[in-house]
């Protein structure tokens, strides 16, 4: 019997919506990354994007455990000497409510063209509404 290998044009993608209200950041991110990769499907193939589309609503209501609200730091660099910027999880949640989840999920996906294609299937919204009703997303409980 030959090993099955999924073909990119034969992959069936579903849409799921996750309500992140009072959920822990890492637990939501790991489940989202798992589904974006397609590892929950029996036809998972490592070199083919077999994942589903994921919509995360209420990203502003995500929580972290312990003192990570003030202690967890995010860094970025402008490219100029001395141009490093640092912000905390709390400040990032106030300014850009979905960015912490996006960064957490992106770090859990493969690096390279396949990973970049996977992260495009993630849609994060700070509030409880989203513009993807036409896709009829199924609710996914974590």
UniProtKB/Swiss-Prot annotation:
<dbReference type="GO" id="GO:0003729">
    <property type="term" value="F:mRNA binding"/>
</dbReference>
<keyword id="KW-0687">Ribonucleoprotein</keyword>
<dbReference type="InterPro" id="IPR005822">
    <property type="entry name" value="Ribosomal_uL13"/>
</dbReference>
<dbReference type="Pfam" id="PF00572">
    <property type="entry name" value="Ribosomal_L13"/>
</dbReference>
<comment type="similarity">
    <text>Belongs to the universal ribosomal protein uL13 family.</text>
</comment>
<comment type="function">
    <text>This protein is one of the early assembly proteins of the 50S ribosomal subunit, although it is not seen to bind rRNA by itself. It is important during the early stages of 50S assembly.</text>
</comment>
<dbReference type="GO" id="GO:0006412">
    <property type="term" value="P:translation"/>
</dbReference>
<dbReference type="GO" id="GO:0003735">
    <property type="term" value="F:structural constituent of ribosome"/>
</dbReference>
<dbReference type="InterPro" id="IPR036899">
    <property type="entry name" value="Ribosomal_uL13_sf"/>
</dbReference>
<protein>
    <recommendedName>
        <fullName>Large ribosomal subunit protein uL13</fullName>
    </recommendedName>
</protein>
<dbReference type="InterPro" id="IPR005823">
    <property type="entry name" value="Ribosomal_uL13_bac-type"/>
</dbReference>
<dbReference type="GO" id="GO:0017148">
    <property type="term" value="P:negative regulation of translation"/>
</dbReference>
<keyword id="KW-0689">Ribosomal protein</keyword>
<comment type="subunit">
    <text>Part of the 50S ribosomal subunit.</text>
</comment>
<dbReference type="GO" id="GO:0022625">
    <property type="term" value="C:cytosolic large ribosomal subunit"/>
</dbReference>
């Amino acid at each position: 019997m030959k090993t099955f290998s999924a073909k990119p044009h034969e992959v069936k993608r579903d849409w799921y919506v996750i309500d992140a209200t009072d959920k822990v950041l890492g637990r939501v991110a790991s489940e989202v990354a798992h589904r974006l990769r397609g590892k929950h499907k029996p036809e998972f193939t490592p070199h083919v994007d077999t994942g589903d589309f994921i919509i995360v609503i209420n990203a502003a209501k995500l929580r972290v455990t312990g003192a990570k609200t003030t202690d967890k730091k995010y860094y970025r660099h402008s490219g100029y000497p001395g141009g490093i910027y640092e912000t905390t999880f709390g400040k990032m949640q106030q300014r850009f409510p979905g960015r912490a989840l996006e960064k957490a999920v992106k770090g859990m996906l493969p690096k390279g063209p396949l990973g970049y294609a996977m992260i495009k299937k993630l849609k994060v919204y700070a509030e409880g509404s989203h513009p993807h009703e036409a896709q009829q997303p199924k609710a996914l409980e974590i």
